[in-house]
Amino acid sequence: MAERRVPRIRFKGFEEDWEQCKLGEIVERVTRKNENMESTLALTISAQYGLINQEEFFDKRIASKNIEGYFLIRKGEFAYNKSTSMDAPWGAVKRLDRYGRGVLSTLYILFRILNEQQVDSEYLVSYYCTDLWHTEVQKIAAEGARNHGLLNIAPNDFFEMNLAAPKE
């Protein structure tokens, strides 16, 4: 009998065989700018609360007055905050769920799933709530002396990280 290719740890609802792939094979980077002022909602990424309005999280807006050069993120897309914290020693990856759209600093790495029929968005939400991805990010991360907890991770390296994903 053929051995099934599944990880020891399973997320509820994902029962299929799994395969190893590069993140960039299942997602694409989002670099869309807020050039047409499609949104004025400045967001931040909190390890605890996800993508959240800066004014709600910090009790003030910390974004620049001119946010046309910020990334525009849409509901269902993901963002990676490279800042380390007690709750997120390797940063935090969160999906935009609370709002229809918002803007983020270009320091963040944004991405969306290439084929929602192939990869369930809930899988990535669950995956990035675990520490399973930390091994991969450790391989590419370097913390600069002047970065004060901001990991030096190039977008190209981020999308080269390996992950186990359910097969089609």
Regions found by a protein language model. Give the residues of each.
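Non-catalytic DNA-recognition/assembly elements of restriction-modification systems
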Residues: 8-34, 160
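A short beta-sheet element
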Residues: 68-133, 142, 146
